[in-house]
Amino acid sequence: MHRRLKDWLGFWLSLYQRFIENRGAGNAAALTYTTLFAVVPMMTVTFAMLSAIPAFQGVGEEIQGFIFNNFVPSTGETVQEYLREFTAQARQLTWFGVGLLAVTAFLMLVTIEKTFNVIWRVRQPRRGMSSFLLYWAILSLGPLLLGAGFAVSTYIASLSLISGPDAVVGAKTLLAFTPLLSSIAAFTLLYAAVPNTRVPLRHALLGGLFSAILFEIAKALFGLYVRLFPGYHLIYGAFATVPLFLVWIYLSWLIVLLGAELVYGLSQPRRWRRQPLPRALILLVVLRLLLARQQKGEALHYAEMQRGGWSLPEDEWSEVLDFLEREHLACRASGGGWVLCRDLHNFSLHQLLECSPWPLPNLSQLPAQLDEPWYPALRQALERLQNERKEQFGVSLATWLSGPG
């Protein structure tokens, strides 16, 4: 029980540390700035797509009202009115103006993907046609699916089994959870589809559930603050809604990025988190596996390494292989794996450590045991090196500073 509690606390602490390392607060601020300029283009594109289908006429206004009533605190009514006016003006733009709005919406999606790729340590973002098709699908099919789902839910809510005198017990209670379920679905889709890497659906679902619950809590607390502390009206007057809306967007992006860190953290092996190895040792492990594969005439894949007992986090695997590729020690094979591209018989451990960005670990950083054939010899060499260092630098600091005399 104590071990589980320790692992649980360590897991959440590691998530917080990664959030700080990835500049989560700064990225949330950047996304808030981007959202400020992209919200009107996104709404314009959504209304344009919905108005193109006669069955969805007027659905856009209903969707907008549903979003502001359920996903934005009580200050959203004024902002909604502003956005409605801006969107009405945007509909009168020429095709060139509409194109600029679409580009703005595209840039917002690009910024979101870049931020997620930093969290997932993805070094190759989507490019070319794959990137264009994904963003186009979000901007075109997204509003249509949203409109269809909203129309279906409205029809279901109007059935006598839901709202009539013969309504099923608990049906209205279930409908009350519709905003929460919508949030879970939206967050899950965001975490599963946006990163340019494979994200397990169950991890995306857990992250979506976490973010949706945190989102509802934040909305309730934010609304409570607005009602109990109205002093901001004395400062900003009629414009008080605008800074509050920006703060809410910022909090929303903080929640999104925290959920993304959780989804990434769930995919990392727990045993590995409990027993971290110095990066220099990971480098030697990967080289040993590459050498063993080369002797069999095969390439090394990340999945095969995990099945072999090395539950190495994917970001550490990528960092090590990037270094080996830069130093022309390993290269990609045609099948997606990795092979050695240099004869290790003519390359010493000293040469490797000289060009490695990761320093040689101290004895205190080494695990007691490691199932690697080279590990006993390395540990003995480090012990001799430490003893020699003590012998060379064991005199008092005052003697060193005084110099020979």
Swiss-Prot record:
Keyword list (alphabetical) reads: Cell inner membrane, Cell membrane, Membrane, Transmembrane, Transmembrane helix
- Subcellular compartments: Cell inner membrane
The UniProt entry lists membrane topology as:
Multi-pass membrane protein
Name a GO CC annotation attached to this entry: plasma membrane
Q: Please give the start and end residues of each transmembrane region.
A: 36-56, 93-113, 132-152, 174-194, 204-224, 238-258
Family, similarity comment: Belongs to the UPF0761 family.
Write the protein's name.
UPF0761 membrane protein Pmen_2988
